[in-house]
Amino acid sequence: MTKMIPPVPTAAAAVMMPTPKQKIGFSIESIVGNDVSTAGGNSTPDLSGPQSPPPGERNVPGSPPQTPPATLTLIPGSPPHHLMAPPAHGLPYPHPHAQQQQQQHLQAPHPHPHLSPAQQHVLHQHLLMQHQHPGTPKSHQDIQELLQRLHHNAAMASGLSPLQTRLSPETEQPQMAVSLKRERSPAPPAMEQAENPAQRIQPPHTPPKSVSPQSSQPSSSPTLLISSPHATPPQQQQQQPPPNYPKPAMMHPGGAGPMMMPGMPPAGLVRPFPMGPGGPPMPQGQPGLPDIKALPPYINAPPELPPQHNPHLIAAAQFQMAAALQAGHVLGPAAAAAAAAGLPPHAAQFMPNPGMARDSYQLYPWLLSRHGRIFPHRFPGSFLVPPFRKPKRIRTAFSPSQLLKLEHAFESNQYVVGAERKALAQNLNLSETQVKVWFQNRRTKHKRMQQEDEKGGEGGSQRNMHNGSGDEDDDELIDMEMDECPSDEEHELDASH
């Protein structure tokens, strides 16, 4: 005889219970909870066919959870009545001695949940065949041998952990449910029905086996249903701890990872500029670290700053993007000088994402041209035109007719201003700025040609070469005044001569 061990429900008890067939019929007494005599067990309507067993047999593991009759008193250490074996000799309930023996079978060290679904199905068919032949009395030794054989096969087949599905609960949740459930006294089934209204209303519901095998657990078992949300009683919702869903990094104030947003770099790379008195304070310098003021504004941002503590994060990111697109009109002198020098060799360890700054240098090549320069506060970025504005300049292509009319206007008057310049621009389909810049370049070229003629004479090729070099200087001077217009039109004149 196996040693009696008090039943300790495990997580496998909620996983491995089979659901061989979905039974539809249930008795009104099991719903209402009225007193039912032990001889009146045949009141359940038989809706599952002629081969369906009586109600005493229907409550095997795998049937929908039903409430035992009120006259049956539950023993504190015993499983519910629908975990017991079918009754002998066609009686609705077995003999008390047979109950004790069957409890010993169920309280073996390896209970039913450790069997595979196929082995449990074999045991279920064996019990059904014995019940269909009431003339042959059932031998408990045969049942015990069958159980031992199945346990041995299950132990030899798989020494692994019990089957875990995607919807299976964590191992801590059944433990908590057991500790809260076992302290309750064995209340009558009517009180259990009042406490668990959800299971009383929906007893015949059995989800598919592939989704939630533990849904066939009985209503009075300590491990409750977990995978089916609509059959969960309110008491179980109070017992279950909140599920540990993966939370994003922005929900943890002390999290190590910065907040990632779709159209923005990480939070460690974005920091508003200290433009006004209401801006964030500058971080203090630490001994042994390089000077923070020497780094670009998106490198020296402290990565441990939580994003939710900075209410101006999104506005600062938009401001920095706009400042970068305006080619440095808003950058301060120290930040511009630091960005000009590029990344120092020791700056990679202070950057949360080193690849982001490299991509930003590719996006904004004007940062690379400000190498080692110091600029005063009051001058905008357009003061720095000569080093980096040349490659981006779009050259205005004048037509021969426009050049001819401009030359005639220059011969008559070298200074075209006011209404005359406006009329000439409208006549040539040009802007006033283009006309003004062309006249400035033409006057500069005329002066240089006069100076070279007075010096007595060098070749025309050398003169054109000097004029080209002088035009570059004039272009730089004029382009600082007229930023919106290109000023290389004089090269067209040199090509036309």
From Swiss-Prot:
Domain of life according to the entry: Eukaryota
GO biological process, one term: brain segmentation
Biased composition (Pro residues): 51-68
Listed Acidic residues bias regions: 470-497
Record feature DNA-binding region, as residue ranges: 391-450
Subcellular location: Nucleus
InterPro entries cross-referenced by the UniProt entry: EMX-VAX-Noto_Homeobox_TFs, HD, Homeobox_CS, Homeodomain-like_sf
GO cellular component: nucleus
Stored Gene3D superfamilies: Homeodomain-like
Keywords of the record: Developmental protein, DNA-binding, Homeobox, Nucleus
Residue spans of biased composition, Polar residues class: 35-50, 161-176
Annotated stretches, region: Disordered: 34-117, 161-262, 441-497
Bias type Low complexity, positions: 96-117, 208-239, 248-262
Chief location of this protein within or outside the cell: nucleus
GO molecular function terms noted in the UniProt entry: DNA-binding transcription factor activity, RNA polymerase II-specific; RNA polymerase II cis-regulatory region sequence-specific DNA binding; RNA polymerase II transcription regulatory region sequence-specific DNA binding
Purpose of the protein: Acts as a homeotic selector gene controlling antennal and mandibular segment identity.
Cross-referenced PANTHER family: E5-RELATED (PTHR24339:SF28), HOMEOBOX PROTEIN EMX-RELATED (PTHR24339)
Additional free-text comment from the UniProt record: The sequence shown is that of strain canton S.
Family as reported in the entry's similarity comment: Belongs to the EMX homeobox family.
Name of the protein: Homeotic protein empty spiracles
Organism: Drosophila melanogaster (Fruit fly)
